[in-house]
C-alpha cells in the first residue's frame, strides 16, 4: 500500500499554568491556556494488512510500549476491533521533553490519521476520549484549537488570542514533569483565574519558580529572553518563550541566541495544521462524492 505523508503534529505552549490543588487520585487540578503553534513534528503512515504496528524515526531509543505513537495506534485498534496495522515514520523536529507537547501531539495525529486511513469512523470527541487515556495534553491536539483548559487539562474551551509571533528557546536540559509535580515546594493553592485575567496579563506559571531554582539553564534562558520581551516557561519546561508583535522582532532576537541553546520562531494560530489537513480531506471527499 502507498504512503500517506505530511501529517502534521504541531507544538503548543502554555501561556500560563496555575495549579489549583491536588485531587484524591494524585493528579493536580490545573488551569492553563494552550496556544497552538504553526511548527511541529511530521508523520507518515502506510497501512498494513497484517495488523502489525512498526515505527521508525525520531525516537528510536524509546521502547515501543513506552512510545505514545505506538500506544495510540494500539489503543485505536483495541477500541474499534480494527485488524489493520501501520508503518509509522516520525520526523522529529521538536525538542523532546521541552514542554511543547511533542509526544502528545504525535499521539493525537496518530489517532486522527489512522482513524481516517483505517476507516474506523470515530468522532473527534471519541478520539479525544481515547487521547485522554494516553495523556492529559492529547485531547487539545485532537481538537486542534487554541484553548483554555481546566481539570487535569482535558476540559477545553476554544479561545481567541492576539496574533503574535513567539521565540521559543530550549536551553539544552531536560526537565522531568513527574519530578516537578512531586516537588515539595511547588505552589498548589492558586486561586481560580479567568480568561479576562489572561488577556490582561495577570497570570503566571506556578511551576516556573521551582524549575528556575533547580535548573540553572532554564533560569539563565529566562533571564536572557526577558531582555527582549516578557518571557515565561511553557508547561514544566525546559523550553521558554517570549511573544512579539512582528516576526522580524522575534527573528532579530533569535539571531542573538547563545550558541549553547536551540531556538525557533513560530506563529500562534487559532486552528492547528492537523485540523486544517483533516478539513481539507473532508472538503475533497465532499467534492468527489455523489451529487
Curated annotation (Swiss-Prot):
Annotated pathway: Isoprenoid biosynthesis; isopentenyl diphosphate biosynthesis via DXP pathway; isopentenyl diphosphate from 1-deoxy-D-xylulose 5-phosphate: step 3/6
Binding site for ATP: 95-105
EC primary class: transferase
GO biological process terms held by the UniProt record: isopentenyl diphosphate biosynthetic process, methylerythritol 4-phosphate pathway; terpenoid biosynthetic process
Chemical reaction(s) catalysed: 4-CDP-2-C-methyl-D-erythritol + ATP = 4-CDP-2-C-methyl-D-erythritol 2-phosphate + ADP + H(+)
EC code: 2.7.1.148
Record-annotated active site: 12, 137
Disulfide bonds: none
Pfam family, one: GHMP_kinases_C
InterPro entries, per the entry: GHMP_kinase_C_dom (IPR013750), GHMP_kinase_C_sf (IPR036554), GHMP_kinase_N_dom (IPR006204), IspE (IPR004424), Ribosomal_Su5_D2-typ_SF (IPR020568), Ribsml_uS5_D2-typ_fold_subgr (IPR014721)
Keywords, alphabetical: ATP-binding, Isoprene biosynthesis, Kinase, Nucleotide-binding, Transferase
A GO molecular-function descriptor: 4-(cytidine 5'-diphospho)-2-C-methyl-D-erythritol kinase activity
Domain of life: Bacteria
Stated family: Belongs to the GHMP kinase family. IspE subfamily.
HAMAP family reported in the protein's UniProt record: IspE (MF_00061)
Summary of the function given for this chain in its UniProt record: Catalyzes the phosphorylation of the position 2 hydroxy group of 4-diphosphocytidyl-2C-methyl-D-erythritol.
Name of the protein in question: 4-diphosphocytidyl-2-C-methyl-D-erythritol kinase
Classification of source organism: Bacteria, Pseudomonadati, Pseudomonadota, Gammaproteobacteria, Chromatiales
